[in-house]
Amino acid sequence: YSKDRAYAFENQLNENTGSVMVKRLQDYRKPESEAMIPMMVFAPTIVNDGRRLLISPQPISYLTTHRNDSNFNFKTTYDEVEFSDLFREQQAGNIRFSSVLRMNATFPYILPAVSLPSEPMIQVMDAGIRDNTGMKTSLRFLHTFRKWIEENTSGVIFVDIRDSHKERPIEEQPRKTFIENITTPLGNIYGNLLTIQDYNQDESYEYAKAWLTSPFDFI
C-alpha cells in the first residue's frame, strides 16, 4: 500500500493531538463494556457496492441483519458488513483507532479512498454518503433492543448535532447554456444528497414511533 496524502494526514493529526488516538480499536472494548465511555459505531461506505462497513470495538453482527417479527415474507438484501468478521484473519481489532476515524471521514476528492486487504480488494469512503447523521445506525440499534429498552429505561432521546440547517431554501436557477442544461440535473441530485437523506430519515423516525412504545424524543 502506498503512503498517500491520507496516510500523511493521519500521522499529522496524531502528532497535532498528542497521539491520544494512537490506540488499537480493541483497546476501547473494555471501557465500553463497563460503560466508562459511550459505545461507538463507525460506518464508512464501501465504494465497490455501496454497502456500509460497520466498525466497533464490540461485536455488532446484529446490526447487519433485518429483524422481521411478522409473518410477512420478503427477501431482503444485506447492506451492512461487519468489519471485525470480514477481517477476522487479519486481526481486525488491532487496527489503529485513528485509521478507523479516517476511514469514516474520507470525504470524496479531499482524501483518497482507503483500500482494505480483502479479496477482492474493497475501498471505503465517508460514512456520510449513506448515513450522514447516524440516524440509520441508531434506529437499527433501537429496533434490535426495543423490548429491553421498553422494560429497563424511561425512554429514548436522540441528539442530532449538525453543521447545517435541515431546511434549505430553493436556489434560483438563472438561464443556462445547453451544456449546463445537460449537467445540472445530475449535479443537483449529487448536491442534494444530504437533503434526500434528511427526507428518508425523517420518514424512518416517524415510523419508529409506531414500533417503540417507550417515550421517544428528538433534539
Region roles according to the model:
Residues 1-219:
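Catalytic domains of lipid- and phosphate-ester/thioester hydrolases
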